[in-house]
Amino acid sequence: MKLIIFTGLVLFAIVSLIEAQAENEKACLPQYQVRTDAPGNCCSNLVCDCYGRYKSGARIGRNCFCLQKGVIYKREN
């Protein structure tokens, strides 16, 4: 009986480890890829930058972008 319980726990640990590795190996997001819910998994040469979206002074959401590291973006009028 103890052997069955131990085997079950070991199998559970192995499956959990495999799922965690698969989560870490997700494809990275390319440049200018937009995510609206949360910062994404940008590729290694990019950085994630998030901005709030507002309408009439009320926050209506958030956009996150994968942008080049070290590049400064300025708003043009």
UniProtKB/Swiss-Prot annotation:
Q: Does the keyword Signal apply?
A: yes
Coiled-coil residue windows: none
Entry keywords, A to Z: Disulfide bond, Secreted, Signal, Toxin
* Localization in the cell: Secreted
> What does the entry state regarding organ or tissue expression?
Expressed by the venom gland.
Q: Which residues form the signal peptide?
A: 1-20
Please give the residues making up the propeptide in this record.
21-26
**Recorded family membership:** Belongs to the neurotoxin 19 (CSTX) family. 08 (U8-Lctx) subfamily.
Q: What is the protein name given in its UniProt record?
A: U8-lycotoxin-Ls1w
Tell me the organism. Lycosa singoriensis
